[in-house]
A protein has these predicted regions:
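Extracytoplasmic and endomembrane cell-envelope/extracellular-matrix remodeling and assembly machinery
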Residues: 4-19, 23-25, 30-32
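An exposed tryptophan-centered "aromatic clamp" motif
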Residues: 150-168, 179-193
């Protein structure tokens, strides 16, 4: 996991796994604990798509950085480019150049990049720009959940590594009703100007890791262990 201080083994080759799409169901079934934003369970339609077998690595993202990804406005959403320019950003949070080589600040202090480790601490804008550079896109939350509910042997790092940005705006599911009182304050009033993240990170506490869990952050958030899983359209 990205919280580990021991360098991981070489990353497995990135492969693509296809899903037929069609009319599917997502959301919590109502059995066991879930937050109100995880339901109601409902049907949605998916076009055929492919999901990457693993998360994007530090080495892969470094190629984006070195290839001028932060200087190419064609790769960025308009608001993302304005934010990047205003902040003067040219690399991910916690990355530093030391004697010509990229390092990143970790829980064990400043360390050289571990190329096979998933890249984290990325905003939605950075994740989206990288996906465009890679000839791909970010998955929707329905695509992510549908894939994760299948036989996931070929699709790894779904949980416990990094929260994965989706291109889905954080909004209520069909039939959602804000609960009365203080309980309704938590999710209902935050359903605007944020994006959904799926999975969980190495820093996720117990009880916040399940197939239907919907995390959410504004597009500029970088402080969490947030990473990238790529998706592509088929047909």
């Amino acid at each position: 996991a990205v919280c580990d201080v021991v360098p991981p083994p070489v990353a497995a080759p990135l492969t693509w796994h296809s899903f037929d799409g069609g009319l599917i169901e997502i959301g919590h079934t109502g059995e066991g604990f879930a937050f109100d934003n995880e339901g109601p369970r409902h049907r949605t339609y998916l076009h055929p798509y492919a999901l990457a077998s693993r998360l994007v690595t530090q080495a892969e993202f470094a190629a984006f950085v070195e290839g001028g990804g932060y200087q190419n406005p064609m790769l960025w959403l308009a608001e993302g480019w304005d934010w990047r320019a205003a902040q003067g950003l040219n690399h991910p949070l916690y990355w530093h150049r030391v004697e010509g080589a990229w390092h990143h600040f970790t829980l064990a202090g400043l360390q050289p990049l571990q190329g096979s480790q998933p890249v984290v601490h990325l905003s939605y804008y950075e994740a989206d720009a990288y996906a465009r550079w890679a000839g791909s896109r970010l998955p929707t939350e329905a695509e992510w959940e549908h894939a994760a509910a299948q036989d996931t042997d070929p699709v790894v790092q779904l949980f416990g590594v990094a929260w994965q940005w989706t291109q889905s705006s954080y909004a209520p599911y069909p039939g959602f009703r804000v609960a009365e009182g203080a309980v309704g304050e938590y999710n209902g009033k935050f359903m605007v100007n944020q994006y959904v993240l799926r999975g969980s990170s190495c820093a996720t506490p117990p009880g916040h890791e399940r197939l239907t869990y919907r995390n959410f952050f504004p597009a500029t958030a970088r402080w969490q262990f947030t990473g990238i899983r790529l998706a592509r359209d088929l047909g």
